[in-house]
């Protein structure tokens, strides 16, 4: 699987993953209460309740 693997503030990058899924996690920016940070990567990790997590299973699906 090919997944995007960067934070929202970084230029787009992709990586080849051994697992069959990608994720996109959205969390609040601690420095800006109105802002959010988006983190992308391989797999579908378990998150604490209240964290927005989207998992998908096609190449580059976590845009």
Swiss-Prot record:
This is Muscarinic toxin 2. Gene3D superfamilies: CD59. The keyword Secreted applies. GO terms for molecular function: toxin activity. Its main location: secreted. Belongs to the three-finger toxin family. Short-chain subfamily. Type B muscarinic toxin sub-subfamily. GO terms for cellular component: extracellular region. Disulfide bonds join 3-22, 17-42, 44-55, 56-61. Expressed by the venom gland. InterPro entries: Snake_3FTx, Snake_toxin-like_sf, Snake_toxin_con_site, Toxin_cobra-type. Negative results: has no effect on M3, M4 and M5 muscarinic acetylcholine receptors. Keywords: Disulfide bond, G-protein coupled acetylcholine receptor impairing toxin, G-protein coupled receptor impairing toxin, Neurotoxin, Postsynaptic neurotoxin, Secreted, Toxin. Blocks M2 muscarinic acetylcholine receptors (CHRM2). Fully blocks the binding of N-methylscopolamine (NMS) and oxotremorine-M to M2 receptors, slightly increased NMS binding to M1 receptors. It is found in: Secreted. Monomer. It holds the Pfam family Toxin_cobra-type.
